[in-house]
């Protein structure tokens, strides 16, 4: 995945036909190279419809998800494998290039103690099986570290490297997120430098998940680090504008983070594109 993309939460978290049509058309209007589809209910998605939409508008796509509680890999690796296989099949049928996100667990998965070796072993077992299935469908499989308040298993770039190397699948990659890095890493560059060997995708998300350039993220440090490692992967803007209550609860989004999607797309996107150009990433 290369170029600039956007998470479809900008317009919808419900990937039904109306939601897909709105998001794909809007992403194309703003000149995106790809979109990231929140695959929260894979069985309900009309893959042929989505594939046709993407082809019509000339967009590539990646899918992302978090595992539901009954399929958390740390405690139910068998259920996680089953859930991921269904999602991978749907992503492949849509013509997507990868499945990423919190593929190892769920938003809100916390035990109150650090992850145990048994939990990490279970996660690795699930991801190994999922990576094999992904490879059979021509897909990459990513893992996204998130902050300590959303999950206790994977919070930093170096933890993601350790998990990728434990699984040992050649089609696995690391997917970082500046919002989570702003909480967990010792400086914006650290996670990028730690994950450099496997880093193929990054969420560009402001400190409040609103409009990039209007918060506390050190964007110069982020883009300088990406330039330093010769990053050629996907740059995906993520801002949580249209959140259904059940997802907003899990992400602790209690108020609007921006006026509307136009504010983010017309101010945040040019800001990020200019930074990428400044550091010769596009």
Put a short name on every predicted segment.
Residues 21, 33, 37-125, 232, ...:
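Structural motif corresponding to the early beta-alpha repeats
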Residues 17, 76-173, 183, 255-266, ...:
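Active-site acidic/histidine proton-transfer and metal-coordination neighborhood
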Residues 5-8, 35-36, 64-65, 100-103, ...:
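Short beta-strands and strand-loop turn motifs
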Residues 11-12, 68-71, 106-109, 147-149, ...:
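A short, flexible beta-alpha/helix-coil linker loop
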Residues 1-8, 12-28, 55, 95-96, ...:
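Histidine-acidic metal/acid-base catalytic patches
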Residues 47-58, 126-134, 191-194, 221-226:
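Catalytic-core regions built around general acid/base machinery
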Residues 35-38, 116-117, 148-150, 176-180, ...:
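Short linear motifs at secondary-structure transitions and domain/linker junctions
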């Amino acid at each position: 995945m290369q170029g600039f993309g956007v998470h479809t939460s900008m317009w919808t978290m419900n990937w039904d036909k109306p939601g897909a049509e709105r998001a794909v058309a809007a992403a194309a209007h703003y000149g995106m190279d790809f979109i990231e589809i929140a695959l929260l209910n894979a069985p309900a998605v009309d893959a042929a419809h989505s594939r046709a939409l993407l082809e019509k508008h000339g967009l590539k796509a990646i899918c992302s998800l978090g595992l539901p509680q009954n399929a958390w890999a740390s405690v139910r690796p068998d259920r996680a494998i089953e859930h991921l296989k269904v999602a991978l099949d749907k992503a492949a049928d849509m013509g997507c290039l990868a499945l990423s996100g919190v593929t190892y667990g769920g938003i809100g998965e916390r035990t109150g103690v650090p992850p145990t070796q048994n939990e990490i072993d279970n996660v690795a077992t699930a991801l190994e099986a999922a990576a094999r299935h992904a490879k059979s469908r021509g897909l990459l499989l990513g893992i996204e570290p998130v902050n300590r308040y959303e999950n206790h298993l994977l919070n930093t770039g170096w933890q993601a490297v350790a998990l990728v190397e434990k699984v040992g699948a050649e089609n696995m990659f690391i997917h970082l997120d500046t919002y989570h890095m702003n909480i967990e890493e010792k400086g914006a560059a650290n996670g990028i430098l730690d994950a450099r060997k496997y880093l193929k995708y990054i969420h560009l998300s402001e400190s409040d998940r609103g409009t990039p350039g209007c918060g506390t993220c050190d964007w110069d440090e982020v883009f300088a680090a990406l330039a330093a490692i010769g990053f050629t992967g996907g740059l995906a803007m993520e801002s949580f504008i249209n959140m259904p209550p059940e997802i907003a609860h899990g992400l602790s989004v209690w108020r609007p983070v921006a006026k509307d999607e136009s504010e983010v797309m017309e101010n945040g996107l040019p800001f990020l594109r200019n930074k990428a150009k400044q550091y010769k990433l596009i």
